[in-house]
Amino acid sequence: MKLPIYLDYSATTPVDPRVAEKMMQFLTLDGTFGNPASRSHRFGWQAEEAVDIARNQIAELVGADPREIVFTSGATESDNLAIKGAANFYQKKGKHIITSKTEHKAVLDTCRQLEREGFEVTYLAPQRNGIIDLNELEAAMRDDTILVSIMHVNNEIGVVQDIATIGEMCRARGIIYHVDATQSVGKLPIDLSQLKVDLMSFSGHKIYGPKGIGALYVRRKPRIRIEAQMHGGGHERGMRSGTLPVHQIVGMGEAYRIAKEEMETEMARLRGLRNRLWNGIKDIEEVYLNGDLEQGAPNILNVSFNYVEGESLIMALKDLAVSSGSACTSATLEPSYVLRALGMNDELAHSSIRFSLGRFTTEEEIDYTIDLVRKSIGRLRDLSPLWEMYKQGVDLNSIEWAHH
């Protein structure tokens, strides 16, 4: 077993060796290096064929028509294109958007930008377990609501929203529904031929493909229109201009093909490992599971260890690559906005760790992790005056701390 152990698969994944090998064939002179938009020679045709195959592989994993897949630079761009593109196109119908407080920043900050441009956004607070109350969602819908954006799987706590029911609710009212499926694609079944979802964002690097490539699903029946945000040569049916990066697209396609083949067995394996990890640490005193094991993605476990400072815990766990909060926001010292939206106090939110498991995680690594976490929590609490006071029965919430 090699240290450190990587348990941050929700931040990014290593490229699968099969994917890397495939990508290598699309870079150099002796490979397929052409521009897929070059129509006058075989270098272009071969590149275009490779892109078509990858587009099919992505569509097959999610039950879509390949013509509904638009390539982007990643899920952040897909979220921006979906939300800004739909809002701008349909703004004559209304200017009201609904989302939730626990969405990824790529959705939240896009909505903030639209607010500056005169749109009105309702931010729903989830229940304690992170799931959106559908009655609250229904109550928030208005005649001028044009778009709902609610994710499939949360990147920090792993809870799964009921996108099928939300889709039905939106379709019945003629509201466009966007789903950020970055954390769920290739891990949970998605069938867009059955789901009433209009726009869906995908990423390559969360499912063993390369970074810098993603896609946006744009429904054809009923046809959804979006306004381009990137202008140029009119690539991707006018929705996203820019030369297609064939090697990255091929990599994403291959990653999605592998995910489709291995999803069922791999998810059962990961669920087993995640449960093993939770069972190994859940009897530590003052340990709280954030999210919901039953309604959760099989590979994410978010836990708070009370009376332990999150940053010191991460340093104590230096042999584990884990995160407190998501990679996109863990550079700030603010506690996770997702956990705060669940109504958690700052102390608990600060002491949370996200373990996210993946394709190369082993049972041996999980057992090592359990052992290390137990030892580290014990050691850090031995040093903590707060823990000592808690053990003596002092109610820490009732203490008036002196401000120096």
Swiss-Prot record:
Pathway: Cofactor biosynthesis; iron-sulfur cluster biosynthesis. The modification N6-(pyridoxal phosphate)lysine is found at K206. One of its GO terms (biological process) is [2Fe-2S] cluster assembly. InterPro entries: Aminotrans_V_dom (IPR000192), Aminotrans_V_PyrdxlP_BS (IPR020578), Cys_deSase_IscS (IPR010240), Cysteine_dSase (IPR016454), PyrdxlP-dep_Trfase (IPR015424), PyrdxlP-dep_Trfase_major (IPR015421), PyrdxlP-dep_Trfase_small (IPR015422). Pfam families: Aminotran_5 (PF00266). Homodimer. Forms a heterotetramer with IscU, interacts with other sulfur acceptors. This is Cysteine desulfurase IscS. It comes from Salmonella typhi.
